[in-house]
Amino acid sequence: MKNILFIHQSAELYGSDKTLLLLLKNLDKNKFKPIVLLPFDGPLKEALENENIEVVIAPVLKLYRKLFTPKNLIGFFKDIKTAFKIVNELHKKYQFTLIYSNTLAVLLGIMFAWKNNIKHLWHVHEIIEKPSLFKKAFVGLLSLKSNTHIVYNSQATKVFWELNKSIINKGVVIWNGIEIYTPESSTSELFDIRKNLFLAQPN
């Protein structure tokens, strides 16, 4: 059994929220145990718990445009301390083999994975043209050795971010599936691919 920490920026049930829910519903629970970290309570938390998936509420270290004010930066650094304390306890209990960050907005996953030498998968839904500082920062984060896999929601997103060889070698496009519109065979094939990304090869 491989334990995976999933980190998401929201607890609503919109686009990326539904994508995460669909992925977790179809994950082979005989092989993988998902633990989900959300920033607050909401309908996504309830939907996940209805699938018997453990959900933990904690700061996810969300990056946003108004972060760079003295007040918000102080709050962000406090959240780092709180978030790391919670995830450290979870890691002691579950010994995660992979951390999955759903959207670029959450930084906790890559930060914790880098510090603790854990494999990290970033599911990228966004194209961020401006501010250019954010774009440069994310290119650097996506290039990190600890960020072992990148899943893009479209070819356009993949092309936008593949600015160096380090990023190119990690990426794959998997279209977001919406359960009600996707034939069963296609959904099964989609999640077979996704699950294969989680397989950690023995050293």
Task: Write out the residue ranges for each language-model feature.
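A conserved, positively charged/aromatic
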Residues: K71, L121-V151, S166
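An aromatic- and histidine-rich active-site surface loop
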Residues: L98-N116, S132
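A short, glycine/small-residue-rich beta-strand->loop->alpha-helix junction that serves as a flexible
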Residues: I7-L21, E129
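A short helix/loop element that forms part of the nucleotide-sugar donor recognition site in Leloir-type
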Residues: P183-Q201
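Short N-terminal targeting/anchoring amphipathic segment
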Residues: G75, V87-V106, L121
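Conserved nucleotide-sugar phosphate-binding/catalytic loop shared by glycosyltransferases and other
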Residues: N30-K71
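Short amphipathic alpha-helix
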Residues: S16-D28, G42-A47, V139
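Carbohydrate-associated surface elements
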Residues: A156, G177
